[in-house]
């Protein structure tokens, strides 16, 4: 093995130069992992995980022994001064800090605390060639005997005390993205990804059906749930939380103050309700909330972290609110209720969509802010424009503790490679600015869906540990794809170089976007197509990680190419030409054919996967209704992420209707005028392009719902066996269609 220096520079990290190297012949079959005599649950949990990874790498059993065992030929001792008599205190006292030192026959990994021991162990494994990604791991071959030139001397600590993720399970849809359809194995992979990447914080949405059924046993239907049986969902949550805590991940419960489901509301018909919220001027709100939160904490345990989402009072965009108290007064009620339930509560409130600093000026000093960087101004108006937030802290008093949350997805019809505020360079600038503020305690990702962009997740995990202004796509490519790094970069480098997305809109309200015909937009599309062709040449010799990345890239370029052809055909029609939409149709059809080959991207396949677990709520119609509403039709169709069903039943149908509209108008010697759009967001370099955006004809909504409900009903009632992996087949003609000529501007009726 080549000598590696293994110096990891982190914010607030003290890295000491490596000692002079000395060659050792290491027999990987004699590798042992050594735990302290008083090892914590966290230390033992990650040692068990590391043993499995090392066994995969070495092809041999790896012993896990106590430090009282006789010394071996190659021992890796992991612990803290509290857990092991052989581990000395390290210089850094920061939680999560670690020190790695020594060489075979003994490497010692010392943590400032148990989390630090965990972090040091996985950092050591990365030095040996392991890499940990959301969708799988890179496991090196450590076989037989090897000459190892390695002596380690490293100490590092994280820039942010809390580093992590938010896994949101509000939507139903493709299994890859929607935690609502995850089983225990899916959750375990997500939590292991976090632990292995030295993350320690998770915003978690606790299921409340079982809790509410316990508090309100007379309420009808709470024992069933909307998709899973309440008991089953509750049991899964308990397992997930226990596993997270065993891996050193603290969980913050996200809670709404005032919201209760209909069966509970029915018990109190004489109280004043508004859109599911109990109006806060009534003392019953605090009483019912405290009962609910008390049972929640008793049933699921707590790490004393809570995010209060208060949507029942004034100035809320999601509902017609109660206005009997101010929003600040409602929050103060929630704080008081939570502190009675948990006197050690660490309460947070999001800045997202709020008026700051006004709201926070009324809060106690111990309430933390979670500053959600959203990336679009006037987000709830008809047209969001440009950038909303600056880097670093929000406009809050300097003594207010806060955490930085990165909202990395906003377009359900985007393919999660580009969004409005989250290319790597943008994230890095904010991380550096946030780390420089001593009041900032944490840095985490809010991906809205889960397991979305592997690249951005990797960037955020690294930035949370050690902010840098220049995340390296090249280094990421080498770590993830090894010898196939250059083909990967051929496809992704032009897209990532382009930076933040310039346009987004809700997927079922798809728009015609002439900006995609601008020269710069066409240049990006042309470069990405060339890169995709390069990636295609290597698919047969690639890993599942490479195939996933290719499908993501292919999806981005197909979506962009189809929209480009649509815009060009329509503008040609406006100019009086007879046009065809065949290039757009061929592109959509090719994309549909690819997405159908990836089961975890299908909405119907997600329903099958849930049904296979055998814990569906009673009544297929109710579950079918939940999948339709929360997977396809909730909030103006917003959750409809890119899936084969979306292409087949929405996007192709919209194209057919556009073509019919245009051809009929042309035969009459007229121009088919399209409506001006509803909501969309843009960051066009020339704002005049926004005036040319138009609304495409809507799909046949009745047919879409009918077909989807029928497919969901069948999937839920007769779940098939899990799909088997198969080789991806492609039609390269998509990448060979002649692109339109660029346009400098567009004027539409």
Task: Label each PLM-derived region with a short phrase.
Residues 137-189, 193-201:
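An acidic-aromatic substrate-binding cleft motif
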Residues 55, 60-63, 72, 141-143, ...:
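Catalytic-core regions of glycoside hydrolase
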